[in-house]
Regions:
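Active-site-proximal substrate-binding groove within the catalytic cores of carbohydrate-active enzymes
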Residues: 1-239
Length: 239
């Protein structure tokens, strides 16, 4: 992978928009919006300067297209409609006791949030439950052929990507997400708490509460029975 010199961002963006205008589409996905320095002695650019240049180009792109950005930093938030690859777990350093969805609570309602690929997680079922707990939409990264064809290539990180192997899991995950989060994607999160051992509750600004149970048995909490390894949604006004 080669990095484009920050000083070339403007020219590259203008050329891209000119060519891209020929394609009838309303959205654009940006793989990377990283900031970095350029130590060219004839045109040195610092990271803060790169950030300013990048924001100017994102503003141009956002005027023409809806933007999906992968793991964007705070400097991209104002221009992002969809963010993909959003982390849903902590580093698990020794001093970390719990994982808190701080980013999701800040951004939910202002943009759509998608997880990192569920099929590449160590436990796909837990990853789907965590996505729903955090109000995110599940993402899968699949290939038409079996992932074994990628052996000895530059794409060995897609170690479990064969679509036919994941088809039923994908349908089940999207069905669960739709039932649990329909109508909530545009709502802000007002509270996230642990309601019981391995049971978490996320409250949205419309009053709905989504309970996620990671236990292998049903749990009754706040007067509701949350199914094992499942979800219960308390709709605003329901008892």
């Amino acid at each position: 992978m080669y990095l484009l010199a920050p000083g070339q961002f403007m020219e590259a963006t203008e050329g891209f928009l000119k060519d891209f205008a020929k394609i009838r589409t309303s959205g654009l996905s940006l793989r990377s919006t990283d900031i970095y320095s350029d130590f060219n002695k004839n045109d040195m650019i610092s990271r803060p300067e790169t950030e300013e240049i990048l924001q100017a180009q994102l503003e141009k792109l956002a005027q023409e297209q809806e933007l999906m950005i992968r793991c964007g930093g705070a400097y991209t938030f104002a221009y992002t409609q969809v963010m993909s690859g959003v982390a849903s777990d902590c580093s698990h350093f020794r001093l970390a006791n719990e994982t808190v969805p701080f980013l999701q609570m800040v951004l939910h309602g202002s943009m759509k949030l998608y997880t990192a690929p569920i099929n590449l997680a160590s436990n796909s079922q837990t990853a789907v439950l965590r996505a729903i707990e955090y109000g995110m939409l599940p993402c899968f990264q699949v290939t038409y052929d079996q992932s074994s064809v990628l052996k000895n290539s530059e794409y060995t990180d897609n170690f479990a990507s064969g679509y036919e192997n994941w088809r039923e899991d994908i349908l089940e995950a999207y069905k669960m997400a739709q039932d649990s989060l329909e109508g909530l994607i545009g709502c802000g999160i007002t509270e996230h708490r642990q309601a019981a051992q391995q049971v978490f509750a996320t409250t949205y600004e419309n009053g709905d509460v989504v309970y996620v149970n990671y236990n292998t048995e049903d749990v009754t909490v706040d007067g509701h029975t949350v199914p094992a390894r499942g979800v219960y949604r308390e709709r605003s006004g329901s008892q």
